[in-house]
Amino acid sequence: MFVKAKKSLGQNFLIDREVLEKIVSITDITNKEVLEIGPGSGNLTTYILKKKPKKLYVVEKDDDLAILLKEKFDTEIKIINDDILKVSESTISDQKLSVFGNLPYNISTEILSKWILNIGSNFWFDSLVLMFQKEVADRIISEFNNSNYGRLSILSSWKLNVKKILDIKPQSFSPRPKIDSSLLLFTPKENFFKLKDPKNLEKITRIFFSQRRKMLKKPFNQVFDNGKEVAEKFGIDLNLRPQNLEPDVYFKLVKEYEDLRG
């Protein structure tokens, strides 16, 4: 059975053997439960199975590809024919999962944000090996005082350690995308800033970075009734811009926001 990549679903199948081998060598998945997101035609799936995982779950939205995967791998994998945005990852297994994902670029940031904001006190995964459009990956790993630094950088660094593994050229895919891709490794942090509601982190960073070229005075006054006092409490110069505040400062501001609201 042959299935053509669907542009509407952002499908680009990874075909580069060297890259495929590199991906499955990043973490030790032997005898572990693994989740693959967007397996497509099963190229990476084949390499994952060579590493002898205890169990391999795959989430594939495309009905045609789900049939292809069933024909190709039969009982070697557990196929979840659904949209990853609708899947509750914590219900897939009671074991921590090693996750691999060639995420559709049109929903990659939405997926990552969803996972980060829904992480409770216990992580449902022990590693995430995810592919992004290079431009998005650069935003995720960016440090403060950089023009790429923003909401994604802060959200990602809250509970996760993030590392770029490699950049991948368009010729490694079929069909070829028009842009470069990057592979990132995410692992859970042992210690992270405790917040009452993660959505407040999303809300406040959205307010600050929707005006990233403005000085901090305006977003401070939008978020806090006493913006100047809060800035003074944390020793923040309101003449700076949102990209000049490191992630820990934003976490403290969110906690202050939650404390003031009771």
From Swiss-Prot:
Gene3D superfamilies: Ribosomal RNA adenine dimethylase-like, domain 2 (1.10.8.100), Vaccinia Virus protein VP39 (3.40.50.150). Pfam families: RrnaAD. S-adenosyl-L-methionine binds at N12, L14, G38, E60, D83, N102. One of its GO terms (molecular function) is RNA binding. PROSITE patterns: RRNA_A_DIMETH (PS01131), SAM_RNA_A_N6_MT (PS51689). Its EC number is 2.1.1.182. Its main location: cytoplasm. Coiled coil: none annotated. Keywords: Cytoplasm, Methyltransferase, RNA-binding, rRNA processing, S-adenosyl-L-methionine, Transferase. It is found in: Cytoplasm. It comes from the Bacteria. It catalyses: adenosine(1518)/adenosine(1519) in 16S rRNA + 4 S-adenosyl-L-methionine = N(6)-dimethyladenosine(1518)/N(6)-dimethyladenosine(1519) in 16S rRNA + 4 S-adenosyl-L-homocysteine + 4 H(+). PANTHER family: DIMETHYLADENOSINE TRANSFERASE, DIMETHYLADENOSINE TRANSFERASE-RELATED. Specifically dimethylates two adjacent adenosines (A1518 and A1519) in the loop of a conserved hairpin near the 3'-end of 16S rRNA in the 30S particle. May play a critical role in biogenesis of 30S subunits. Belongs to the class I-like SAM-binding methyltransferase superfamily. rRNA adenine N(6)-methyltransferase family. RsmA subfamily. This is Ribosomal RNA small subunit methyltransferase A. It comes from Pelagibacter ubique (strain HTCC1062).
